[in-house]
A protein has these predicted regions:
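N-terminal secretory signal peptides
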Residues: 67-90, 95-98
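Extreme N-terminal basic, low-complexity initiation segments
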Residues: 2-8
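Carbohydrate-interacting regions of secretory-pathway proteins
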Residues: 64-68, 77, 93, 102-106, ...
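Positively charged n-region of N-terminal signal peptides that target proteins for export
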Residues: 18, 39-44
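Sec/Tat signal peptide C-region and signal peptidase I cleavage site
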Residues: 59-63
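Short, positively charged and aromatic/hydrophobic N-terminal segments
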Residues: 13, 18, 25-26, 32-35
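Bacterial N-terminal signal peptides
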Residues: 46-57
Length: 362
C-alpha cells in the first residue's frame, strides 16, 4: 500500500458509519504508528482459509423455516460479535473487517485493507481467519498477529504492541426514504392489501412470498429488507429471497455478508451478472435496494426489439449500472413479454422482512 494512497484513505469520511454505542475509540490514545513497510508485512500475514473454502463451507441448503430467526429479540450469544469493524491502524492506515457467525461459537473474519466494502476498500487482497468464542471473547487464529474481539472492539496484537478498531453499524443513506409526490406506495406498514398474496407481521412488516396487485412497465423502485439471523445455515439456504422486477428479472436477496459477491448472492442479477461490489450488511440490519428499471421493448407483433435494462444501488452504493437483461432470470414467475408485470418478493423458506416499498413510474 503506497503512502499517498493511505493518506487519501485517511481523509475520507464515510457518512454510512455510526459507532456502536459500547465501542471505545482507543486509536488516538494508542500512539502507535505503523510505517508503510510494517503495514505491507501485516497485509501479507497468514491467509487462513481461501475464499473458495469459505464458499464451500457455506453451500449447504437447509429447508425448514425458523420464524424466530427474523426476531432481533431472539438471538444467541454469538450475535453481538457478528458484524462490521472499522478504524485506522496507528492513525495512518484504514482497515475494515466483517465477522460472520457460523453457529456454535464459530466465526469467520474477512479483513479488508483500506476499509469496508463501499467505504474505502478498493479490491485489494483480502485475508480470512477462523475464530471461536470463549465466554465474552472471540479469538481468531492464523498469522503472527493476535486477533480478538471483546467489548465491541477488534484488537490486534504484535510484538508487544496493540491497536483496536471499533464495531460499526452502517446505515444506507436512503433508509426510510419518503416516497415522492405521485409515487405508488405498495407497503407502508399499515396494511398488506396491495399484495396478493401478502401477509404482515404484528409489528407491521411485510413477509416473504408477496406479489404486488399493481403491475408496472418502466419504473423506479425503493425497497427495504431485513435478513434473518441464521448462523447454522449455509449458501442458498441462508436468508434466501428475491426481488423480481415485473416478476421476470430477479435481484437476489441472500445473507451473503462477507462473501465474494456472485450473481446468486445478495445484489446479484440471478444467472446474469455479479454485483460490482458485495454491499450486503449483516443479518437483522435494515438494507435498501434503489432500482431504476427500463422495461424491454416489443413491436406490434410482440417481437422483442430491445432488452430490459437495470441500475441498482444496494445500501446507497452503485452495484449495477444500466445493465442489459438479455433474458428473464431463473425461476421467474412470468415469461418475458410486452405486458406489465408485478413485483414479486420470493418465499424461499426463509423468514425475510420488508418495509417502505414504493414505485415511481417512468
Amino acid at each position: 500500500m503506497e503512502e499517498k494512497t493511505a493518506a487519501r484513505r485517511l481523509t475520507r469520511r464515510n457518512s454510512l458509519y455510526e459507532k456502536h454505542p459500547n465501542s471505545v475509540d482507543s486509536l488516538g490514545r494508542a500512539g502507535y504508528r505503523f510505517s508503510t513497510q510494517v503495514m505491507l508485512k501485516f497485509s501479507r500475514l497468514s491467509m487462513g482459509l481461501t475464499a473458495g473454502l469459505l464458499l464451500a463451507g457455506l453451500n449447504t441448503v437447509s429447508a425448514a423455516k425458523n420464524v424466530d430467526a427474523a426476531d432481533p429479540k431472539k438471538v444467541d450469544a454469538d450475535f453481538k460479535f457478528q458484524g462490521e469493524y472499522a478504524g485506522s491502524l496507528g492513525g495512518q492506515y484504514d482497515v475494515g473487517a466483517q465477522v460472520i457467525a457460523l453457529g456454535g461459537g464459530k466465526f469467520k473474519m474477512i479483513l479488508y485493507p483500506g476499509g469496508l466494502p463501499g467505504a474505502g476498500y478498493e479490491g485489494e487482497e483480502k485475508r480470512e481467519y477462523d475464530g471461536a468464542r470463549d465466554g465474552d471473547t472471540v479469538t481468531f487464529t492464523g498469522g503472527t498477529t493476535g486477533k480478538s474481539i471483546s467489548g465491541g472492539k477488534l484488537t490486534f496484537e504484535r510484538d508487544g504492541q496493540s491497536f483496536s478498531i471499533d464495531r460499526t453499524i452502517r446505515k444506507s443513506p436512503t433508509l426510510s426514504a419518503k416516497p415522492p409526490e405521485g409515487a405508488t406506495v405498495l407497503f407502508n406498514g399499515k396494511s398488506a392489501k396491495n399484495f396478493k398474496p401478502g401477509k404482515m407481521t404484528e409489528d407491521g412488516l411485510l413477509m416473504e412470498g408477496a406479489n404486488s396487485v399493481a403491475k408496472f412497465q418502466s419504473h423506479k423502485l425503493h425497497l427495504e429488507f431485513r435478513l434473518p439471523y441464521e448462523p447454522t445455515r449455509r449458501g442458498q439456504g441462508r436468508a434466501n429471497s428475491g426481488c423480481y422486477l415485473q416478476a421476470r428479472y430477479e435481484v437476489q436477496v441472500l445473507d451473503s455478508f462477507g462473501l465474494a459477491g456472485k450473481h446468486n448472492e445478495c445484489g446479484g442479477i440471478y444467472s446474469i451478472k455479479d454485483p460490482d461490489l458485495n454491499m450486503c450488511f449483516p443479518p437483522l440490519q435494515w438494507q435498501t435496494y434503489d432500482i431504476d428499471f427500463t422495461a424491454a421493448k416489443y413491436d406490434k407483433d410482440g417481437k422483442k426489439t430491445a432488452n430490459a435494462r437495470i441500475t441498482v444501488r444496494h445500501n446507497g452504493v452503485l452495484i449495477h449500472d444500466n445493465v442489459e437483461l438479455p433474458k428473464r432470470t431463473t425461476a421467474s414467475p412470468l415469461a418475458e413479454g410486452p405486458e406489465p408485470g408485478f413485483l414479486h418478493l420470493q418465499d424461499h423458506s426463509n423468514p425475510l422482512r420488508f418495509r417502505n416499498i414504493w414505485v415511481v413510474k417512468k
